[in-house]
Amino acid sequence: MIFKEIDIDSYKELRPFFNSVDYEACEYCFTTLYMWRDMYKTSYYIEDDFAIIVGEYEGDRFSVLPLAKKDKIHKAIAFMINYFKNEDHRIYLRAVTKEVVELLQKDYPGRFEYIEERDYFDYVYDAESLRTLKGRKNQKKRNHLN
């Protein structure tokens, strides 16, 4: 199995897979993966039903959730587990949804440790609040603009 490095042309290949998931973290956006590709040595592998994205950080190999439709997620996760096993790497998943944690706990009981890494959570903003900057909560932002 050959993983390809992410480049600008990868978008066309990966786009259908990004469109097939409803994950709402920045790791599931092609632009983010492309922007950070050198820092995280991001690469991908495409199978008929799914795409696997892997990277490296501080010497540890990691993956985000497979890009797969819900009815193919079991197959994609099994593939990913085998990949890490064959490469003799510990399985390290990032940006995992609660739904997939429940799936992993059910399908692979006791196999994984689940740790919330608060430093890696995405920021979520209310668009209307940022547009108007009303209220005390946005006072510093308003003052910065003035």
Q: Residue ranges of each PLM-predicted region?
A:
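Amide-forming acyltransferase catalytic core, primarily the GNAT-like/NAT-type
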Residues: 1-48
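Structured loops at beta-to-helix junctions and adjacent beta-edge loops in soluble globular domains
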Residues: 6, 48, 66, 126-128
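Residues that form generic nucleotide/phosphate-binding pockets
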Residues: 17-20, 79, 83, 103, ...
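Conserved donor-binding loop and adjoining core beta-sheet/short helix segment
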Residues: 29-99
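Short, glycine/charge-rich beta-strand/loop segments that flank catalytic centers
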Residues: 89-107, 118-121
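Acyltransferase donor/substrate-recognition loop-hinge adjacent to the catalytic core
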Residues: 109-146
